[in-house]
């Protein structure tokens, strides 16, 4: 995991920059939490799909009928899961940044 952590952090930053170009900072903690929750739900969905495809792959392996199509699905869904996890991290950073920005403007 350490071999790619720095790369993932860069991808989180890239996702955050893209989101910030398209959408304003969170207006409240409630809004930020709702967006993070939505991203977590999407990540959970992809994880459930990974589990399903792996179970089918494992069933095929145990029956000696091959499991490549299911393993290809595991690969695809795992990549989707990684993207969703990056979005969760980016929105968590946006939450932090939004709160700091609101605190700064309240002090003025």
Cite the ranges covered by each PLM segment.
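Flexible "arm" and connector segments at domain edges
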Residues: 1-108
């Amino acid at each position: 995991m350490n071999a790619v952590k720095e790369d993932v952090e860069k991808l989180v930053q890239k996702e955050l920059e893209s989101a910030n170009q398209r959408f304003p900072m969170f207006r409240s903690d409630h809004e930020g939490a709702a967006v993070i929750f939505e991203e977590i739900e999407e990540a959970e969905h992809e994880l459930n799909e990974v589990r399903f495809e792996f179970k089918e792959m494992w069933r095929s392996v145990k029956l000696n009928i091959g499991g490549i199509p299911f393993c290809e699905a595991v690969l695809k869904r795992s990549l989707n899961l990684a993207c969703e996890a990056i979005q969760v991290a980016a929105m968590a950073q946006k939450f932090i940044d939004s709160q700091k920005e609101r605190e700064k403007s309240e002090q003025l």
